[in-house]
Amino acid sequence: MVQVDLITGFLGSGKTTFLRRYVQYLVAQGHSVCILENDFGAVNVDAMLLQDLIGEHCDIETISGGCDCDTHQRRMRTKLISMAMRGFDRVVIEPSGIFDVDEFYDILRDEPLDRWYTLGSVIAIVDAKLENKLSPQADYLLASEAASAGLVVMSRTQLAAPGEAEAVIDHLNRALAGCHCARRFGADDVLCRDWNALTTADFARVDRCGWRQTSYVKLHFDEHKAFTSLYFLEAGRSVAQVRQAAQTLLHDAKYGHVLRVKGFIPDGSGWVELNAARDAITVQPIPSGQEVLIVIGEGLDKAAIETAVRGC
């Protein structure tokens, strides 16, 4: 059977960055891997960031769009059926940051997928710089995406102050208690290390971490209404201008609660990727891109954000 690993995590936690490293480890171990990318919105930016991994032993499939639950399940099921025919021995799925994890388990239990796939590891990426105060909906998603994880992998630990990562795990455990889940994470359930220092032994630990059977009380809300994804194509702005716009959007409440700004910008000699959260903005070169900026958050003012992005 093909082993499926799921990498979960709230918006902007660093799932794609970790997935890249994890898949490189799996390929080095001799596995043939297919990545299934499911981004929040109509343009799959994260899949573009992984294109250089494609080769003899690695390929990428995508599901894009904030569609309804039934349509999303149907698309994922169809992708998994087609992937099963292609001879991969490992599949790694990176869902969007507002993914209902139960959807995934339901799909794997369906015929004929239950005969072709086995669930390997559920890996939850949690930002060591996570905001202290989140909305009830965001806290629920944080908890539900980690509840069945075999391991929590902390991101951006090198930027965290002493005690900050531990406080985030306390936050996660409070969020789990808030949805009446018995699961709690302690030191043995968490990998807290600068990702630049991760070893083969660390990735082997991730590979064998498995998953946990758990339950929690669902918070019923429409994730795609609570969390909005706005797309701005061909804004015609420089890297410096987009960086300044992202900084403004993330720190001025008049635009709504902006959680993340990401996208690609032409810089004259090629393309750069911008990835911005409230406490950090990174800009780095990439081989290719599409001129698009995506703003994700809660209660967003589209008109005001478009003015800030386009500078008009």
What is each model feature region?
Residues 121, 150-151:
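Well-ordered beta-strand positions
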Residues 2-8, 13, 17-135, 140:
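Nucleotide-state-sensitive switch-loop elements of NTP-binding domains
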Residues 111-117, 142-143, 169-178:
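A short alpha->loop->secondary-structure connector
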Residues 51-55, 145, 181-185:
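Short, conserved catalytic or adaptor-binding loops enriched in Gly and charged residues
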Residues 291-297:
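Short, well-ordered beta-strand elements
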Residues 140-141, 148:
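Short, glycine-/small-residue-rich phosphate/pyrophosphate-handling segment
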Residues 151-154, 159-289, 300-303, 307-312:
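C-terminal accessory "lid"/substrate-recognition subdomains
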Residues 3, 72, 100, 145, ...:
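Helical mechanochemical/support elements of P-loop NTPase systems and associated helical scaffolds
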